[in-house]
A protein has these predicted regions:
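Membrane-proximal helix-turn-helix segments that form the acceptor-binding/catalytic region
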Residues: 131-154, 162-163
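Conserved donor-binding/catalytic core segment of Leloir-type glycosyltransferases
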Residues: 154, 190-221, 234
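Carbohydrate-associated surface elements
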Residues: 159, 180
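Aromatic "clamp/platform" in nucleotide-sugar-dependent glycosyltransferases that forms part
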Residues: 284
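A short, well-ordered alpha-helix in the C-terminal region of glycosyltransferases
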Residues: 230, 343-357, 366
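Conserved acidic donor-binding segment of nucleotide-sugar-dependent glycosyltransferases
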Residues: 316-328, 336-342
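Short hydrophobic beta-strand element within catalytic cores of glycosyltransferases
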Residues: 301-305
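Nucleotide-activated donor-binding/catalytic signature segment of Leloir-type glycosyltransferases, i.e.
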Residues: 246-264
């Protein structure tokens, strides 16, 4: 494999970029470190240049939320005759990221396409409206599996692999390469007894969008406030749903206990995680839950929903965190951890130990294995978990 094309509806610089975009760009950076030429085609957004180079990746941007797809396909078609923004791009493999909707790159390119799916979007489509939601789910659940019936699939967790199989994708074509994690920055504190706040502090690290259900974290704090008067909640991240969440905090009477930090840099993010006692991730759906591992790097256990599917892979229930089924159980689990420092510390240290198992180098190596096999016309299946190259 000498050249790879990455297709994704957003990049990490996009105001709504998140964990799925981070996964793809980290993989791209690992591939460039191998000497592979990597191009990322994605959507534009205000202030973003049409072309730039980031971590060795050539980034090409055009289109918006929905037009990014046809414009990418048009660019691929033009590239075949030496025209357009992707002229000169001759990939040996393509990663076609399906965030609900794939690019269907295989229709216009001769290179083998690997379909990257972080998780299914059935629960998220209703936010787009009834008509768009029904069309989107039909594309994701019916059209895409049919069009890609011979393609390699790549996903980030075992539960997501099960979801793909339920949509009719053969298990023999589903490879799982889990997320990595970046080391805690050298200039940031690492979670320890001396970094924790004096007052009980819960942290949420997430994009602020409806399916992340941050309302449930607010509700849990409201339930616990009478019993734990000094309880604090730090919300790290931003998104178009932020104002609704701030209104919700006021309605619950806990605005004075909640700090919305918005987007922060890496050092500040880790500083906030290092001072927390418990991390809450109440998402309706997660492919993996990168925030679980980032909190774990600081010895902070996570409480999240079993129904999110992906968290059943990133959290070892009862060991590195707690899986629950509703907001009442969420509040109870958080309260129990806040009340029991010994149990919280043991669980946090187990989480920290597990976090050391994940690195972007390993993720990059695993994805390279999948791409190399696809370039040879072979399929890869199961959990791909290579150790770093010495």
């Amino acid at each position: 494999v000498r050249e790879v094309l990455l297709l994704c509806w957003r990049d990490t610089g996009h105001p709504q970029g998140g964990g799925s975009e981070r996964y793809l760009e980290q993989v791209g950076a690992q591939l460039t470190a191998r000497g592979i030429k990597v191009t990322l085609r994605t959507a534009g957004y205000p202030g973003a240049p049409r072309r730039e180079r980031i971590d060795g990746i050539d980034v090409s941007r055009a289109g918006g939320r929905y037009t990014v797809y046809p414009r990418a396909l048009a660019a691929l078609l033009l590239a075949r005759i030496g025209l357009g923004p992707l002229r000169g791009v001759r990939p040996d493999a393509v990663i076609d990221t399906q965030n609900g909707i794939p690019f269907f790159a295989g229709v216009v390119t001769r290179a083998p396409s690997v379909v990257l799916v972080h998780h299914g979007h059935r629960e998220q489509w209703p936010v787009a409206g009834r008509l768009v939601g029904r069309i989107g789910w039909w594309i994701e659940s019916r059209l895409s599996p049919r069009v890609h019936r011979d393609n390699q699939y790549l996903t980030v967790s075992l539960p997501s692999a099960e979801e793909l199989a339920a949509l009719g994708v053969d298990n023999s074509r589903i490879a799982v390469v889990r997320n990595g994690a970046e080391p805690v920055p050298a200039d940031a504190p690492t979670g320890a007894a001396e970094t924790r706040t004096d007052e009980p502090t819960v942290v949420v690290l997430s994009r602020l969008v409806p399916h992340k259900q941050i309302e449930d974290a607010l509700a849990a704090v409201a339930r616990l406030r009478d019993r734990i008067p000094r309880l604090r909640l730090d919300v790290i991240g931003d998104g178009w749903w932020a104002d609704n969440l701030k209104d919700n905090a006021r309605e619950l009477g806990i605005a004075d206990a909640v700090t919305f930090h918005g987007h922060v840099d890496e050092r500040r993010k880790h500083e906030l995680l290092a001072r927390a006692w418990v991390h809450v991730l109440p998402s309706r759906k997660e492919g993996w839950g990168l925030a679980v591992i980032e909190a774990a790097q600081h010895g902070v256990p996570t409480v999240g929903y079993r129904s999110s599917r992906g968290l059943t892979d990133s959290i070892v229930d009862g060991a590195t965190g707690v899986l629950v089924d509703d907001v009442a159980q969420l509040a109870d689990a958080v309260g129990e951890l806040l009340d029991d420092p010994a149990a919280r510390t043991v669980m946090g240290e187990k989480a920290r130990s597990r976090a050391r198992e994940f690195s972007w180098e390993q993720t990059g190596n695993g994805v390279y294995e999948v791409l190399a096999a696809a370039a040879r016309g072979e399929h890869t299946a199961g959990l791909i978990a290579p150790r770093p190259v010495d």
